């Protein structure tokens, strides 16, 4: 049971994770070289809410195949009861061009004696087709080595977060939908973000103004396709995830903002409560 829960917690982390839309123009990625955001992860089951992990998202300017890029990095490690029964030390990297387009993704899974690498390389054809080389391997053998082809918006799971952060809220209306696909192994999983307006998020002693989105994910790891997960993005110029909640077959996974450094703009979405 714990192995399954840990795996799904990791899926939730990816949504902490570009082109312009038909009716909504995407703005410049709200990133800053050296940006870092820390998160706490929890497993929630009824009244039980236990610490399950820690995650760090960081961004820096880099190069990919000789061209300028944004390097987006996710570090995840288990904690609490998950750490005791199913230790995880996982990393994910992706490179975005300055256009921006997702160019390359690498996920390294380190779970005790189990080590796995998932690489995705994206090539954009003039016809609008995207060719994706998916290569999955362990230290001893290749598990998957195949080509995926798609049209539209296709990302790795971390890159989907960059897509959400790029959206221009100034012209967004309630109920707006943003479909995309996620490349995983041999599969292209259909998903979409749905905008439902502004909300206040509270966690411990902190409050944040946010924009709320549902995530519809058509994958058997989630209890239902519609509203399988939710994400609350800080309502300021940084567009960083403040809270994420994913329904699991047993309970739910929740991710909360903890701290941030070197953001592009002040974190004005945080509501400062005057002490009496």
Residue ranges of each PLM-predicted region?
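Bacterial N-terminal signal peptides
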Residues: 8-20
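Acidic, serine/threonine-rich low-complexity disordered tracts
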Residues: 24-125, 166-276
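Intrinsically disordered, low-complexity peptide-like regions
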Residues: 8-9, 143, 233
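Hydrophobic, well-structured mid-protein blocks that either form specific transmembrane helices
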Residues: 120-162
């Amino acid at each position: 049971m714990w192995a399954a829960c840990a795996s799904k917690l990791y899926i939730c982390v990816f949504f902490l994770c570009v082109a312009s839309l038909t009716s909504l123009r995407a703005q410049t990625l709200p990133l800053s070289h050296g940006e870092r955001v820390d998160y706490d992860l929890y497993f929630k089951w009824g009244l039980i809410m236990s610490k399950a992990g820690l995650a760090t998202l960081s961004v820096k300017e880099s190069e990919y195949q000789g061209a300028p890029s944004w390097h987006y990095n996710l570090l995840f490690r288990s904690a609490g009861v998950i750490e005791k029964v199913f230790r995880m030390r996982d990393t994910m990297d992706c490179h975005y061009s300055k256009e921006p387009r997702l160019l390359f993704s690498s996920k390294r899974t380190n779970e005790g004696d189990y080590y796995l690498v998932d690489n995705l390389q994206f090539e954009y054809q003039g016809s609008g087709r995207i060719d994706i080389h998916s290569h999955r391997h362990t230290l001893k053998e290749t598990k998957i080595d195949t080509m995926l082809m798609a049209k539209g918006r296709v990302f790795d799971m971390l890159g989907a977060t960059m897509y959400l952060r790029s959206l221009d809220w100034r012209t967004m209306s309630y109920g707006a939908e943003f479909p995309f696909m996620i490349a995983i192994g041999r599969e292209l999983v259909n998903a979409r973000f749905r905008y439902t307006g502004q909300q206040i998020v509270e966690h411990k002693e902190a409050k944040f103004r946010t924009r709320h989105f549902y995530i519809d994910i058509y994958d058997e790891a989630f209890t239902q396709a519609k509203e399988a997960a939710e994400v609350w993005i800080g309502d300021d110029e940084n567009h960083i995830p403040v809270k994420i909640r994913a329904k699991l077959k047993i309970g739910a996974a929740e991710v909360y903002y903890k701290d941030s450094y070197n953001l592009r703009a002040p974190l004005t979405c945080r509501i400062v409560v005057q002490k009496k």
